[in-house]
């Protein structure tokens, strides 16, 4: 029996996700607690005080002298809690040590809070272990274990009398337990410290009857309180009925050696429980109902009451361990679910185990429903009002984040009894395991594999084979596998480039003709196939590489685990949770009853062969909702073996869900020697313990449950009897089956969810099986969404609607045409053959129960996404080695590798996932806003352009929600150009601007960057769509060049400019000498002449003396002032020894510097702008007009150095002023550094962005006029565009004036003049926009006016104030 009880303690192993004790018999240190390395400590925790507890020799009185009014006096055979303890010195050592003694034990970091364990159970009465004197005769075993002792035995602490129903063991602090279903175990650190008020014992303390009010930071938000209240009301009547089961049901999941009269498992009355019909029970229920709203401050410390209500606290409708929804999301409360349903009914039990008192409980449910509605209407407003008044700060996002972090903290867990299926004897262990399977477990595995594991294969083998007819695509694939795809420009790596090769209709008909198909409207999965054809149409060469083919660089085969052990030393355990909980909380979760407790499915445990360190959270969009998949390192449940996990995985993922294309080994290792899957999964059926821990159901109990449930849905021999059942009895059975997954081995698909079960007999002469009704979803390829006619009509409808919205006058005929198209679309949607929702009716003959419900399948479909995410980030660590830089922000590296065509759908064959979700997932998932897919991704259309470009910049750096690498490519392009320009400028001091530009073009062109990307093997790490987008080599090389620029931008963004320079230099030159020359360039020639400073020359140079005035004006003192002089030297000036040349080379460098600084600013402060939008903003910021305006405001024209001897003021052209500013930027960078340039542009350039955005200066007049004209196009005709004609040319050749007119639809709408044709066209377009009433232009003005009314007022006031200042100055002078 002691061996059986060893499953209730966790042992720790260093460096792994499971605990494992080391050491010999006798006194050993306290069990080390586990804390994952990648979790931060939320609150400072004090280490627990180690103590040795010697239980008293005689049992103490469990009840106080004055019994509690809510309970009956204790019965003579009542089992006290805690059970009496024998003295440690009297009893012999147990035959099996508490933890197996392993050498070289290493202590691990503790949990944030060490778990509290009840005391050691007394030894079993057996011939070798006599009963303890003084113990009551009915005393049995208790399933808890105490941590091993660590010090010599001190005198036992005296037991202090308390006025409570039960006495707590010293291992528990006497505190009120939090609701275990929503909060992780988190004690106050002071609860583990010696109490100052307790002089009798230094190891425990007594708290006041009610705890002090919580701090504001620890209170729950009103939404969470409502969540608790609604959930508690909903399942209020379930906690009591679970105890009143028939005897055979209570004994069902238990080993025979534990079913004895003297064990702890006895009837309800033997436990001292109040009878169900006693009036004190009703009184206690009323008190609990009034008190439960304030249960954080008042909760009975009775442990028995906690056990009685633990199932209600956890919630029957919670089938997954979930975290709260993030800030900004509306949580889906159980109370809201109750209010929205027509008929309220509690969750039903599964597998046809019905309580004999269901009729009485139904009356109580109805009564509870009425009381709930009364309480809700009377007390909700007042209660929530008071809460919100007291705690307004709880609505802040940081509070929600704190609650989420607390929920994600690991909790201590334990396993249920091993029941002789596992042995934890250290002499039986193999390798680094802590548990090894016994012969009894081996027999269970053989039975499971025989009855369930091979059932599908046997059924398929019994059916006649079917060879589908070959199509043109099959023949083409066979030919392409023989002749490999060449890498020239015209070659293709996909056979889908020719549309005539593949006939979708023929492929769909072929799948419909399968003889084993279960129903015409149920779609099934075939390996490597989608619903409309093969998944991969790539050539044999292309299939050997790429993440899209599930080939992750750096992966190696894993040595197989030992099947009959838990391999605790080499596996890392993680608990998987999903947030928000929408669509993962079901009203009929999968529940397993064992040992008079109900274990609810909460998700999956994942066992990895390597620690998942430095891997970000997995985010995925499903049901139009952004989900986050968390994997939290936790203590490992010990009672499992790897073979049991694999048997369950094959049963669920292969036989039930039919995920044939989900490969956890990798295609490269399929033909290699046997290797282990990279992850093992274990379903978590848990019950919450009163002290914040969890009890996880052992794996063998799950397999036994599946074997028990494996029986016919409607047995043939009982069908006549079932048809004679009363209507109520049949409804009970049908309700139990609703949401259950049933399987018909050998069919396609094999498994389906039951939504209704009908027994109507249409032919009185023939008895037919009941009908299974399943509500499914037709694949998009076969519904109206995939119909070519519907798509064409939809496009024409949207186009016409847009034209009418922008038309100045809408004709009645156009309105009728739009209504006709809308009606035609509606008719197509309502066709039975085109509707997405279908109703499937199947005969229940041949269907078998599986024991699982849709919640298990719902969570199982998240696992392929998570495994793909983890494997991809593990292979990115291999990329870190290739580039020589380790990213701290792993999401940034993933973003750099993500092509715009990539979409993370399901982590595997998308049609397989959709089919399995439709067949076995929840019936009616709740969908979010469909805009979530393109909310931050859409960039087409004039309205989208105006909407995005009207957004002002963020004050603080904000992360972008655009999840591809185009923005990083925009930044990386500027970084590459800057690095190239700087190095060329310094390495070739005598080369003019034209030569420098030629060299730079050769380095930064895409063809060369693709070669550098090939050195890093970026094509093996890139994420892009598995389709024809990048099949051609030219397209792939272009994408690789963009990916390389994005990678450089990511290195610059996270690392520094120096890191980007080193990476670029390593890739440019393989030769170390050339690389050294490139990286260590010389100083500027003016700096080489005067290494320290040249300001001593100011005294003898009038030119330099004048430049000191400019230095004082801008507040920057140059170390080498001759650099500033060269920046202001125009190219008309000949060579001189002061400047050693003119400013044309500096202009080349300054342009690249300004591009980089402006690009970085826009990238950081405009997170919602795509690459094209950022380019428009940068063009409005870094252009000749803006640069000339800044140069003029700074007075640079006064300091320009020319060859004019008269020293008369000369009006410089716009281009010349812009060149002066760019040269000054280069001089500032050479003399100082890039930080000075950032500051200069922060002051002189970036504040102008607001004005540019409000005035829409980012859009030049010609582009704006063309956009307005295109909105007025007529359907079915070529769009009219504005035409420009030169009317007149006046003046000499060096000073001509051009007159240009613009025409639209044959009508002149504007005219303009300018010194060049381009400027004259701009003037004509501006004149047309002002005179012609374009609806689009009016819409843009109204949009900006409504959005920024206050900003526009302030801007106009500032402009008027600036215009009045010169006039006031002139008046003062007069």
Curated annotation (Swiss-Prot):
UniProt subunit comment: Component of the microprocessor complex, or pri-miRNA processing protein complex, which is composed of DROSHA and DGCR8. The microprocessor complex is a heterotrimer; each of the two DROSHA RNase III domains binds one DGCR8 (via C-terminal region). Interacts with SP1 and SNIP1. Interacts with SRRT/ARS2. Interacts with CPSF3 and ISY1; this interaction is in an RNA dependent manner. Interacts with PUS10; interaction promotes pri-miRNAs processing.
Impact after mutating residue 1045 to Q: Impairs pri-miRNA processing activity. Abolishes cleavage of the 3' strand. Abolishes enzyme activity
Composition bias, Acidic residues: 475-491
Top-level taxon of origin: Eukaryota
Binding site for Zn(2+) 1: 536, 538, 549, 1026
Protein name as catalogued: Ribonuclease 3
Region (Disordered): 1-95, 130-406, 452-497
Gene3D superfamilies linked: 3.30.160.20, Ribonuclease III domain
Gene designation per UniProt: DROSHA
Site features described as Important for activity, chain residue numbers: 1215
Bias type Basic and acidic residues, positions: 216-289, 298-313, 364-399
Protein keywords: Cytoplasm, Endonuclease, Hydrolase, Magnesium, Manganese, Metal-binding, Nuclease, Nucleus, Phosphoprotein, Repeat, Ribosome biogenesis, RNA-binding, RNA-mediated gene silencing
InterPro entries, A to Z: dsRBD_dom, RNase_III, RNase_III_dom, RNAse_III_DSRM__animal, RNase_III_sf
Domain notes: The 2 RNase III domains form an intramolecular dimer where the domain 1 cuts the 3'strand while the domain 2 cleaves the 5'strand of pri-miRNAs, independently of each other.
Needed cofactors: Mg(2+); Mn(2+)
Cofactor note: Each RNase III domain binds at least one Mg(2+) or Mn(2+) ion.
Tissue and organ expression note: Ubiquitous.
The record's account of how the chain is modified after translation: Degraded by autophagy in response to neuronal activity in motor neurons.
Annotated positions binding Zn(2+) 2: 561, 609, 676, 680
Catalysed conversion reaction: Endonucleolytic cleavage to 5'-phosphomonoester
Residues that hold Mg(2+) 2 according to the record: 1147, 1219, 1222
EC number(s) from the headed UniProt entry: 3.1.26.3
Feature: compositional bias, Polar residues: 59-68
Domain (RNase III) ranges: 876-1056, 1107-1233
Domain DRBM positions: 1260-1334
Effect of residue 676 to A: Impairs protein folding and stability
GO molecular function: DEAD/H-box RNA helicase binding; lipopolysaccharide binding; metal ion binding; primary miRNA binding; protein homodimerization activity; R-SMAD binding; ribonuclease III activity; RNA binding
